[in-house]
Every structure is written in C-alpha cells, then in structure tokens.
C-alpha cells in the first residue's frame, strides 16, 4: 500500500530571490515581459524538479504567482477592478491592481492599488478582491492552464492548486453599501465549473482546492453555502479540499457532506483535531495529513510523527496521504545554502527543500521501508539533543521572567497627566508631522552594508558611512520642515533582523528569505535560545541624530509582539514566554534611550493584529499576554517621555479596546489605502490618546497630492478631535526612493500647515460666536 506524498505549495521567489530581482528590473523598464516570464518559467521548472527528485507523488502547479496567489485568482476569474481595465488583461494589469498606477505612467489617469492585507495570521500579504453587485466572472487569464501544461510536458504528474470559491469571496470586500458579496456565489461557481472543465481536458486527475476559511468560526450563511457550491462544481476531476492554519472541527459536520474526494487538515497547527476527523471521515475519501510544518524552519520529529501516523495508516491504507501542513511558501527555500551555520545549529533546521524530503521519508517509512524507518530515528536525534542543550536555557533570563508583576506593565501615571508633561517638554504644533521611521535604503547603503559584512569595510569606516546617511536624512527632514524627526534606520537591513542580530538568543541566516508580498521578501531571524539584551542597541544612533538638530528625534524600536510574529519562534516554549523575554530586553532599551535625552520613543507593533488566533474564542488569551508584553516594554518610560506605536494592515473594529489598552501616548496606523475606512472603529469607541492615521500609501509608487492628504485628514478629523491628530505616512519609507519620498512628504507638510490655518480659523470663529452669545445674554 503506497502512501501518497505531496505538498500544498512551494516557494516561488527562488533560492536567491531571482523572482524579486526580475520583477523589479521589469518595473524599472530594464527587461521586457518576455525576459520576466522566462525567469518565472525557469523557477517553476526547478521547483518541479526538486519535488520530483525527492520522490513526491505529485508536483504542485498553480502555486506560482507574480504578486500573490489571491491576485492571480482575481485575474483567472476575469475580476479586475474597473479602474484597472485597459484592454485584454496581461501582467501589467496584474501589477497595476497590486501596485497602483500614477498619472505620469498612464495616458488616461492614475488608479489606486487595491487594498492589501495579511493572509490569515501569517506575514504573507494578499491583494483584497473587490466586489459589487454587478460583478461577473469569466475565465480569461491562462496562467494556471499554461503552468499545468508546462509541468506535464516536463514529465511530471500534476496536482493543480486553486483558491476555493468561498474563500475567494470571503477574503474580499464589498465596495458598495447594501450588498452582500455572498450573493455573487452562483455567478462565481459558473467560472469555477469552466476552470475544472479545462483542467479535466488537460488530463488532471486531482485538483487541490484551498478553503482555509473552514478553519475560522464561520457564520451560518457562509458555512451553509459550501454544500451547494461543491455540488455545483462537481466534475470529472477529483477534489482534495484543503484546510490549514487551525482546526476544522467546528466545520466538520458540514465538510463531510461536501461533494469532494478528500480532505487535508493541518496537524501542525491543530494536532488535536485528528481523532474527530478520523471518526467522521467518509469511507470513500482520502485523508491528507499535514504533519510537516510549512510555517517554520525546524526539523520535523519524523520519528514521533511516524509513530503517530502508523495507526492511521493501518486504518486507512492507501487513503492516507502525507503532506506539508500548508504551502511551503512560508518557509525559506534551501538550508544547503547556509554555509555559515554551525553543524549543531544546522542540524536543528529544515527549509522548504528539506521539508519536501521529510514528507517523502515519512511516506516511505509508513510503507514499511526498513531503511526509511531507521533514517527517521537518526534524523530526529538532534531534536532530542537540543532539549537539554545548556546554552539554550539561561537562568538569568528565567529569573527576570518569573519576577514579572502587574505593576511592571503599568506607566507611572495615567495618559491625561502624561499628556500635560509631554506638551510642556515637546512644544509641538497642531497636527504635528512625522514619519514612521525608515527612509530609503539606497543602493549606496546596501553596497556599504555588503562591504562591511564581507570585511571590505572596517567597523569604523562603516560607522562613519552610516553617520553620513543619518546626517543626510536629518538634513532632508529639516528642509521639509517636519516636526518630529527620525534617524532613518540606515543601519538596519530589516526592522526585526536588526534587533535579532543584537539580542542574544537569535540566529540569523544568509538566504532564509520568504515572500511578504509582490517583490517584497523578508528574512526572519530564528529564536534558538532564551533572549536577553547584553548592551544598548539603538542609543548611539539616536543620540547622534539628536545631536544634529534642535527638533525632537524619535527613538525607533521594534515591539516584542512584532519581533515574535516576524521571526521563526521556538517550539519548545510558549509564544507568551518568548514575548516576555523580548519585552524585558526592550524595556532596558527604552530606559537607556530616555536617559540619553530621547524624549519620543516609538515601539512598532505592526504585527499585533496578525498574531491573533483564527478562532475568536482564543483571542482574549492572546491579547492578554501580547498587550502585557508591549506595556512591559514601554512602562519604564517617565511621564514626559512620549511613547508612540505603529500598526499596519490592521482591522481595528474587533480589537479597538485592546489597542487602547496598549496605553501608548500616540498610535500611528495604516489607513490611506482604505480611504480612512479603518477609522470607523473610532466612531463608537472614544479612543482616549493621540492618533496618526496614515495619509500616504507607501506600498504604491503614487505620490499623494496636497489635496488628497487634506481630504484624508479632514475625514479623520470627523472621528478624532483635531488636537489629538498627527499627520504621517502609512508605514516606513525604506522601499521608496528619495525623489518620491521627498515629493510626498513635501505635500504632507504643506497639507498640515494649510489645515492648521483652517482649523485655527474655525476655532476662532467658534470662540467669537460663543463670546457674542455670552455678551448678548449679559
């Protein structure tokens, strides 16, 4: 009885980010579409060869995307937003939807990018589909079918992957009031019927249809819609219904009624669901078990997994499939490239290529292959050895964590009192202007960083180079007349990796890249041991920048929850414990910054929303320790020290009270793409502190006009008292260039100055009317 082995998807970026560099060359006009497509084809061919060489039963097709797989589905369904429809859709259409289009690059008019948000609770992003009641769907984008043909012609047995119709609808948004996007399902299903019919003609036996929303707590109309949907799209192609990121037990009674041929569940995220799934699995279905974790870098304990799966194999026989838990796009590509790791540390890890081999090894061992069973035993030994490694567990760190009290997570006085102290010290105008932290990482900075890391630049030479970039950033900000400055973070390759490199307990990699969105890749550090700060990290750079200006300089820290969410965490201790260790380290940094004369300190927490568990019933437990971790970090600040925090891609409605519970003096948030829609959360909740809703979408090359910014700030002022508003971009400016950055910030500053005058006139008029009324009554 041969066990079928497969994965849900493979990284598309290339082991050395080949796709990223090709995309960016294309966007700069340095290569044409044919050259870009050639790079994509080469990457797909290599990925399929990796899967086939390892011995997987299927090569997965359709997991490749030029920007993100949800946007690919949008193009597949012919569902391009009207503002981006210019002739027959091609790659430029796809990039316009994802990146937007400025007037200068379009003969007609500019067009805003579609919203972008996080893919469930990961650090991957997708472009949000837009729905209106007139929408139709038509299969017009051939990428999926072309890639199936490519794989077949290369000699592979193919399993295409497709985002399911219910998940596609659910992950989108209505762009008009009084309309429910679920009513579009019948039209959408017609397109899915056409897709499956085409795949059948191509000789496809199995298709993987991803419905990750089945791991959520779905409302009844959405859950009920599944039965009809899968009856309608039933075809000659067998369907593996794929779920991941959490348990599907809540939806299981509906799932087992569906007209599909198999179910995939994520046992890495929710191992407890196995018994319930086995008890209700239809007799004619296959069961794919995701036992190799696609979201981390840790070597799988294949010995333990084998012991767990053997009874399932005995019960199901060939109906048992072994798989990755989710797509491997969340893992780096290949551990073999990491020549700088010690043999011990290397033995702890497995990247995507190695995870493919783990899946195959488990399949062979389940089939009774003696050599594979023995290999499982040997392969798992480093995991056991690590549990007792003395350098992984530190008594000093454990002692501090054990001493945490409620008082440690509280500022010394309430916000109202802090605000008075801060107003006296900072002397800021109405609608103060600032940026979120980073400035463009120029090619010069990257070359110098590379030269330093390769030994071509000494530490002293590199420090002088960085000081030059900091001085330049300060000079540019003063010329723009921003109110609160930043040093620009020239020394930081990444907002998380930089702290990981300067905190004990982390391991960084050279090629551990994963895709975040589009061409944006991140290289998450790995938590390998207890975390502690051995010396100040940012104080020197911030104090140098402050010495160059009389304006206020913000110290810039990445918060404990974001560092946790944007790294690969340990699996031997809880996420809460890691967050507490990080919080204590950052608390020490806050103390040192204020002692060095930095009056404003930003503790970025852009990832706090994405860290929420998928099930709402699990939210409060997470929020309790996540908010505590932030407050521990910030609570060493004196009343006159203003603590800022920043969040992006956040949906605040469900966590607005928790955002307030952070007790940050100022919060800046991403709102420009949604045209200030995110501020609806503040209509019913009286947010007590200051807020800076973003007015410049830094993810798009478009430069916002002064009028656009004025309009956004006025919308914000309808929900937030103007005296508590700040004016700032959505996010850091690292990925932009200096000309567009300065142009956008010039408009931002001029908009703020114009609005100060307008609001001052309104205030004067109101005061005059009030005075006249008093005099009349007198």
From Swiss-Prot:
- Tell me what reaction this enzyme catalyses: 5-methyltetrahydropteroyltri-L-glutamate + L-homocysteine = tetrahydropteroyltri-L-glutamate + L-methionine
GO:BP terms for this protein? methionine biosynthetic process; methylation
Return the InterPro entries for the record: Cbl-indep_Met_Synth_N, Cobalamin-indep_Met_synthase, Met_Synth_C/arc, UROD/MetE-like_sf
Binding site residues for Zn(2+): 646, 648, 670, 731
Write the Enzyme Commission number(s) for this entry: 2.1.1.14
Q: What class of enzyme is it?
A: transferase
Entry's cofactor comment:
Binds 1 zinc ion per subunit.
Q: Which UniProt keywords apply?
A: Amino-acid biosynthesis, Metal-binding, Methionine biosynthesis, Methyltransferase, Repeat, Transferase, Zinc
Q: Which residues bind L-methionine?
A: 436-438, 489, 604
Residues that, per the record, bind L-homocysteine: 436-438, 489, 604
The residues that hold 5-methyltetrahydropteroyltri-L-glutamate are 17-20, 118, 520-521, 566, 610
Pathway membership, UniProt: Amino-acid biosynthesis; L-methionine biosynthesis via de novo pathway; L-methionine from L-homocysteine (MetE route): step 1/1
Q: Mind telling me which CDD domains this protein's record contains?
A: CIMS_C_terminal_like, CIMS_N_terminal_like
Q: What does this protein do?
A: Catalyzes the transfer of a methyl group from 5-methyltetrahydrofolate to homocysteine resulting in methionine formation.
**The protein's name in its UniProt record:** 5-methyltetrahydropteroyltriglutamate--homocysteine methyltransferase
